[in-house]
Amino acid sequence: MTKATDEGTVIAVQANYYWVRLRNVTSQPLLCTRRTRLKKVGQKVMVGDQVRVELPPSLLLHGRSNTAPVPMVAEGDLGAIAKVYPRRTVLERPPVANAEQICLVFALTDPPLEEWQLSRFLVQAEATGLEISLCFNKQDLVQETDVKFWGDRLAAWGYAPIIISVENRWGVEKLQEKLRSRISLMAGPSGVGKSSLINLLVPGVEQQVKNVSGKLRKGRHTTRHVELFDLPHGGLLADTPGFNQPDLAVEPAQLIHLFPEARQQLTGQECFFKDCLHRGEPDCAVGQDWERYEHYLTFLEEVLAQQNPENSRETDTGLKTKTGSDGQEYDEPKLETKKYRRHSRRQEHQELQSFCEQTDLDNLQEDWE
C-alpha cells in the first residue's frame, strides 16, 4: 500500500525529532522521525531542509482552498522523513540548510557598538558566501550625527546598513522588504534586540526577551536553538543563539577576500608574489591605506595560529589568548578540567526523565512503522 506523503520544510530540530511545516497542512507543524534507511546512509536532517514526509494514517490531506477544512494533526501522530532534497547552501555553525542571506543585527548603543566585534562578525558572515544585510538597531537612543557617522564609515567598508528602531518601529519596513520570500539567518551579539526584533517581524511568536546586563553592559544569551519562523509576507527567518566572538574558520589566503574594500582593490590586478599575505610585501596590490587593515592583520595572525596549534602559547604555557573589545590580545590562565566530577542527583533524575519520554516516542514510532 502506497503511503500518503507531502513535502515541507524542517523548521526545528530537537534531539532525533524534527518539526516540519508541510505544504498542505497549515494549522501546525508535524513532529517527524527520520527513516532508518536515511540513518544507514548517514543522511543528516538540518533546519531549512526541504523534505518529503510519509504521513501518519490519521492525517487526512485536503487541497488548498478557502472552503476546505483545515487539516489537523492529532496529538501523538508522528510523520517520517523519507527523503531530503539537495541543498543549495549549507552552514555548519549554526546548522542551517538552504539559507539565502544573513541579517547581522547590531545596536548603535546599549551595548556600545564595538568596531572590532562588528568587523569580526562581518568577516565570518562573508565566509559563508551568503548575501549580507547589516542592520543597526536602537536608532531612538542616539543622535542623528551618530547615525551618519556609522553610515558613512560602513559605506567605506563596503556596506549599506539599515537603520531601525524596534522601540518605535522606525525603519522596520525596509528590513521586511529585504527578508521577503527568502530564507534568512539572523545573527549578532547578545543584547542588541534580536529577539525583540523577531517578535516585531513575526507577530505572535513567543521569544524570551531579557534585559541587557547593567553590570557588564553585555547582553545575556536568550536564544538557545535554531528555529525557522514564518514571516507574514512570505519567507522564513532563523534566529540563532547569541555569541560574542564568532570563530574565524577560514584559510589565510582567503581572509583578504572577506574584506569588501580590499577585495575591490584586487579586482583587475594581482600582487607580485602569488602567496602574498598582504603584510607589507613588495608590490602588494592591496596596500595598507585602508581603515580595517589593522583588523585584517590581527585576524590573520589568529588564523595562522589556528593552523599551527603546536606553536601556540596555549600549548606551551598553559595560557589562553583572548581578544579584547579594542582588538588587543591578552593572556589568561586556562582552568583545570574537572575530570572526576560526579553527576548530581538532580542531573541523574533529569536524564532518567528524558529517557522515559524518548522511550514513549520510540514506541509510537514502532507502532507507525
From Swiss-Prot:
Where in this chain does the record put each CP-type G domain?
88-246
The protein's predominant localisation is cytoplasm
| CDD domains membership | YjeQ_EngC
What the entry lists under PROSITE patterns is as follows: ENGC_GTPASE (PS50936), G_CP (PS51721)
Q: Which spans of this chain does the record mark as coiled coil? A: none
Organism of provenance: Synechocystis sp. (strain ATCC 27184 / PCC 6803 / Kazusa)
One Pfam family linked to the record? RsgA_GTPase
Q: What is this protein called?
A: Small ribosomal subunit biogenesis GTPase RsgA
Its gene is rsgA
Molecular-function GO term, any one = rRNA binding
Q: How does it assemble?
A: Monomer. Associates with 30S ribosomal subunit, binds 16S rRNA.
GO CC aspect terms: cytoplasm
UniProt KW keywords: Cytoplasm, GTP-binding, Hydrolase, Metal-binding, Nucleotide-binding, Ribosome biogenesis, RNA-binding, rRNA-binding, Zinc
Q: Where is the composition biased (Acidic residues)?
A: 359-369
